[in-house]
Amino acid sequence: MRPLRFLFTPVIKITASQNSTEICYNLPTSCRDIIQQKVLDMKKLIHSLFSLTVLVTLGVYAEPAKTWTRDEFQIRDPFVLPDGDTYYLYESKPWSGGKGVAVRTSKDLDHWTDKEMVLLLPPDVKNTAVWAPEVHKYDGAYWLFTTLTFDPVKPDAKDAPSYLKPIQPMLEQGFKGGNLQPRGVWVFRSKSPKGPFKPVKMGSVTPAEWMCLDGTLWVEDGVPWMVFCHEWCQTGNGRMMAAPMSKDLSRFTAEPIELFRAACIPGAGHVTDGPFLMKPKSSGLRMIWSNFLKGSGYCVLQCQSKSGKITGPWHMHTPLYTRDGGHGMIFQRHDGQMMLSLHQPNSKNERMKLYPLQVTWEGFSRCDWDPLGPGPRRVPNGRGTEKGVE
């Protein structure tokens, strides 16, 4: 007869939560050790698989984000905001279309992230173009100025939004206008340079009856001003305008004043574009703006205020850049070097170009040389130049 003890199969109970193995029947010590080791190995495998899942979820093994060099992406009117250790580059869809504004960031001005939207216009804003976005830090917030264009509004239109008005010609004798469309400078606010930006009002801050574009911010004696262009399409000869603003930048507090007109120097065209103001430490208030010059095409001009105030008078209109590029702005690199940013060529293949600027007693020195190449490059602070700006 077979011994009774062999009719029973030992039962092994494993309690994983207590990290122990309970043997219901006696087994040799070597068997218990083997089983316990297998349990520990299984736990380690499960823990490793769980950790791997978490790491993949967090993107540790994801491909690094793509960066772009300046010659790899199209952009018009490139506006750079240095903030902290980061440069912010704002852009809209070039030429026409678009429903908002995007930003790219960089640490070195050579390599830029992919663009992220910082402004999405409300669905009921039926614009046809978004132009020339720029962001200014003022009164503890970030303010985005951009130009919106709309389809023409008929005088008897009943379904047009209240912020759109018919545009009537205001042509000077001897000048021809262009296509008359509602166009104005809208202002948006955010707590961060990366948005989201929200409108300070529904509609343009510039007069609704005027075709206006390219608004920029200048603060003088604590008062914010908008400098903007009254379009040549409506006036014939483009006008550079300025108006003081309310503290929340939602309205003008006085009627706009005229600073100068496009055809203010020999050979100049009738376009006023892209004003930007700066006051170097040892000289007066200066402005750069864009027009067309005979024999040069689209260009950047510079001028200076005789009084040192925004109201001018403005004089010494001279070329700064004359190689079919324009709508410039000036910013200070992290090392203090002043830089000119513009788009070039003035076509649908435009790219952002950067040039170091030198300041002399008579204005910014010409910068018609080739743009900075790839990689870090520094321009020495030579005689007659300044790094600091107010």
Can you name each region flagged by the protein language model?
Residues Y25, Q36, Y61-E390:
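Carbohydrate-active catalytic/glycan-binding domains of CAZyme proteins
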Residues M1-L4, V11, T15-Q18:
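Short, low-complexity, charge-dense intrinsically disordered segments
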Residues S17-Q18, S30, S192:
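Short stretches within intrinsically disordered, low-complexity N-terminal or propeptide regions
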Residues S48-T57:
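Bacterial N-terminal signal peptides
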Residues R2, D41-L45:
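Positively charged n-region of N-terminal signal peptides that target proteins for export
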